[in-house]
Swiss-Prot record:
Keywords: DNA-binding, Plasmid, Transcription, Transcription regulation. PROSITE patterns: CNMP_BINDING_3, HTH_CRP_2. This is Transcriptional regulator LdrP. Disruption phenotype: No production of carotenoids in dark or light conditions. Does not activate expression of TT_P0044, TT_P0049 or TT_P0070 in dark or light conditions. Coiled coil: none annotated. Residues 142-161 bind DNA. GO terms for cellular component: cytosol. One of its GO terms (biological process) is cellular response to light stimulus.
Length: 195
């Protein structure tokens, strides 16, 4: 088991893929750096999920994996895995594929406001969420929201300010409080599921 700090890179695009990973605790995102310098989130890895699947083929990692929270990760040698273990990996990757397909639909449907509402509700069911005396919040930056909603930070900041003015959310440093879940669900239009 290895611990990674928030924002720490687990592997980089182009590195030789010798290790298949399983997330034990925390939240990881798989990202791609675009030619224009923007980072886009391709997939969220939840506890129990496998990632770095390029190791199953013995290829280089195609994307970069980064911890969004403090994360505990188990490294596995796919060559040492038995048939049943590989079958578990395949089932998990199939579940993740369904999430990725839903995530693609999320990015391609609705205005930015709806995409942000969906993403905040999605994060409420991940290790990025917590509760304090003010209510449920997610620990996320405007930049991370932009990366996950095919947007830019400035546009995200404007939408968050509108949602805050309307009483749907409150914000603090790297925290977004979800004050009115029903209204956020109406804004979202459809759910982006974590499981």
């Amino acid at each position: 088991m290895k611990r990674f700090a928030r924002k720490e890179t687990i592997y980089l695009r182009g590195e030789e893929a010798r290790t298949l990973y399983r997330l034990e605790e925390g939240l990881v995102r798989v990202v791609e750096l675009l030619p224009d310098g923007r980072l886009i989130t391709l997939r969220h890895v939840l506890p129990g999920d496998y990632f770095g699947e390029e190791a199953l083929e013995g290829k280089a990692y195609r994307y970069t994996a980064e911890a969004m929270t403090e994360a505990v990760v188990q490294g596995l040698d796919p060559r040492a895995m038995d048939h049943e273990a590989l079958h578990r990996v395949a089932r998990n990757l199939a579940r993740q594929m369904r999430r990725v397909q839903a995530y693609e639909a999320h990015l391609q449907t609705g205005e930015l406001r709806a995409r942000i509402a969906r993403y905040l509700l999605f994060l409420a069911d991940t290790p990025l969420s917590a509760r304090d005396r003010q209510g449920i919040y997610v620990t996320v930056s405007h930049e991370e929201i932009a990366d996950a909603t095919a947007s830019i930070r400035e546009s995200v900041s404007k939408v968050l300010a509108d949602l805050r003015r309307e009483g749907l959310i409150a914000t603090a440093y790297r925290r977004v409080y979800l004050l009115d879940l029903a209204a956020l669900e109406r804004e979202a239009g459809s759910a982006l599921e974590a499981a």
